[in-house]
Amino acid sequence: LSTADEWSKQSAIDYYAQHRHEVSDLYPSEKVFLPRVLFPGIKVLDVGCASGGFFNIMRTYEPAIEYTGIDLSVKAVGMARERYPEAKFIVTEGFGLPFEDNTFDLVHCTSVFNNEPNYQAMLQEMYRVSSRFVLVDIRLLKNIGKQQNSIYNIQFEGGRVEATVPYVVNDADEVANFILGLKPKPKALRATGYFHQMAKEAEHADFEVCMTVLLVQKGDAGSGATVIDLGNLPIEFSVSGD
């Protein structure tokens, strides 16, 4: 189910035009892995790029990047192209990514999985087109079993509710086990994050979830056990990299 119309509402377009373009706009968890995985000449795919803010953030850390941003909103991509003509932006919908295997060194995706129930299909495609790293954020809880879905209001800056999309919280072990089952086997799975109240636009904004950033390092056919480093999360996992 496409949410292109919902994310093209004016309050969403205006919000991402004004926010999330500078390193100072990043959440603490977003500052941990991103500067460590960027290097001169890196080829980056940014999934859910909105108006292109992460291009500016990434080039602040590393000026020599080759950046491609994709988003389902025609309006957002139009703004990104106008603001950052030196980068590449594409409108695309659905779970299939229009790129060959191992095209990008880094596939980055933030503020998407918390509104997408089928994170598995997206993550599998991102892993496929990456040759080295996949960096994503996701909302997690321990021992909830099945995925929890509620409502997220497209209502930025205190205006009226223009539309609604899902707000998704996933089971921590289920997500980790899905990642560990990717082919080829990941070399490493690392994470950082903290408990925080849901976004104020969410239906249960007073409820705390683990705001999690996951860094998956892609393996190859000869990869052995996956290195698992989840110690920076306030959640205990019951998973094995064997």
Region roles according to the model:
Residues 164-191:
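Short alpha-helix
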Residues 51-95:
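Class I SAM-dependent methyltransferase SAM/SAH-binding core
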Residues 120-133:
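A short glycine-rich, Lys/Arg-flanked "PGG" loop and its adjoining helix->strand segment in the class I
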Residues 1-38, 41-50, 135-160:
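Conserved class I S-adenosyl-L-methionine
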Residues 108:
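A conserved beta-strand element that flanks and buttresses the S-adenosyl-L-methionine
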Residues 96-101:
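Short conserved loop adjoining the S-adenosyl-L-methionine
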